[in-house]
């Protein structure tokens, strides 16, 4: 016989915490939050204390490809998010405004429209672009948000335009605010351990303070082992909430072919120094130019290989690339790379997102 609904709320919080901590799928934990208020409190606490393996967002996904990924990755597509056929909603934005959504609950938050950017106004006035052009769809290169958009004080930081400048908005803002303290083109941004960071093409790291009255980007430290390195740089979150800088290097081998390799540096907040990470130690690292860059414990997170880097490679449509992207895995110990997936569509976008707030 089914238990009365009231009895579900009478389970001890300690018991609920134990049960929820043993759930490995974020969707299961979020579904538990809908049972009653006590379950919501316990499941929310567990949910935000955990690091979940990311979803793979694919902008153009066929049903056959989705079946292929069913035993490897959790896959998201615009159709699953309710945006299929919506010409005003794109992966990074639209002329009418941005959206932020959770991939499980599909909740949506409105953000300031692209037209509030002066660069967009100039392009439209000069007729250099039209509202539905590919250039406008890819105007925002990357977006990251503070921990939860359920918070009244949430903030969103973006990299925008071809010169890769920074702008941000706070809850209720009608337009984007430029952050003009960064001298060089920005390679990547991240929200890590309660702080926004940016890294420019020269390898300078900035702490981005996005206050309403005095927003600024302050250099994090004067020296770094990757300063002036011309390779692609990512800002990533370690599985214990420390800041990582990941260098993606292309080097010529003995056969005069280019080989991809990675270097990782961890920032010590107490000494303001960088330490080279020599091993992923059972972790899997996920990298993508547009999406989340994060390390998780591979053994607890499904079918991912440990000591491996899962990265999106190839031409990035957001920076004018016209070729296909592909998903590959770099095995840390052997230094071997295996291509996992290449989409059929030449303009397909792929990136990693986590089961928290997803920039759209």
Curated annotation (Swiss-Prot):
InterPro entries (UniProt xref): F-box-like_dom_sf, F-box_BR-signaling, F-box_dom, KIB1-4_b-propeller, Quino_amine_DH_bsu
Domain F-box: 6-54
Gene3D superfamilies given in the database record: 1.20.1280.50
SUPFAM superfamilies assigned to the protein according to its UniProt record, in alphabetical order: F-box domain, YVTN repeat-like/Quinoprotein amine dehydrogenase
Cystine pairs: none
Entry protein name: Putative F-box protein At5g55150
Source species of the chain: Arabidopsis thaliana (Mouse-ear cress)
């Amino acid at each position: 016989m089914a238990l009365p609904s009231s009895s579900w709320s009478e389970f001890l919080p300690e018991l609920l915490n134990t049960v929820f901590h043993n759930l490995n799928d974020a969707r299961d934990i979020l579904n538990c939050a809908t049972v009653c208020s006590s379950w919501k409190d316990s499941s929310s606490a567990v949910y935000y204390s955990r690091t979940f393996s990311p979803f793979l967002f694919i902008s153009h996904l066929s049903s056959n490809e989705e079946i292929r990924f069913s035993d490897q990755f959790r896959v998201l597509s615009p159709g699953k998010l309710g945006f299929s056929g919506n010409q005003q909603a794109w992966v990074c934005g639209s002329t009418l405004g941005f959206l932020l959504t959770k991939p499980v609950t599909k909740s949506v938050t409105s953000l300031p429209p692209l037209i509030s950017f002066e660069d967009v106004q100039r392009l439209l006035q000069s007729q250099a672009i039209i509202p539905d052009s590919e250039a406008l769809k890819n105007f925002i290169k990357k977006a990251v948000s503070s921990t939860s958009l359920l918070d009244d004080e949430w903030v969103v930081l973006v990299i925008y335009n071809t010169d890769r400048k920074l702008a941000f908005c706070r809850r209720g803002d009608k337009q984007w605010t430029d952050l003009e303290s960064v001298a060089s083109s920005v390679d990547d941004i991240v929200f890590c351990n309660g702080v926004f960071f940016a890294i420019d093409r020269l390898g300078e790291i900035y702490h981005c303070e996005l206050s309403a009255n005095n927003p600024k980007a302050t250099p994090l430290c004067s020296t770094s082992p990757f300063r002036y390195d011309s390779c692609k740089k990512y800002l990533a979150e370690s599985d214990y909430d420390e800041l990582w800088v990941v260098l993606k290097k292309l080097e010529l081998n003995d056969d005069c072919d280019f080989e991809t390799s990675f270097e990782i540096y961890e920032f010590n907040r107490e000494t303001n120094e960088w330490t080279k990470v020599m091993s992923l130690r059972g972790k899997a690292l996920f990298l993508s130019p547009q999406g989340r860059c994060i390390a998780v414990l591979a053994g607890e997170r499904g079918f991912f290989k440990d000591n491996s880097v899962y990265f999106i490679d190839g031409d990035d449509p957001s920076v004018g690339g016209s070729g296909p992207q592909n998903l590959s895995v770099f095995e840390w110990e052997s230094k071997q790379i295996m291509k996992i997936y290449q989409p059929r569509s030449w303009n397909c976008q792929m990136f990693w997102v986590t089961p928290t707030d997803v920039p759209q």
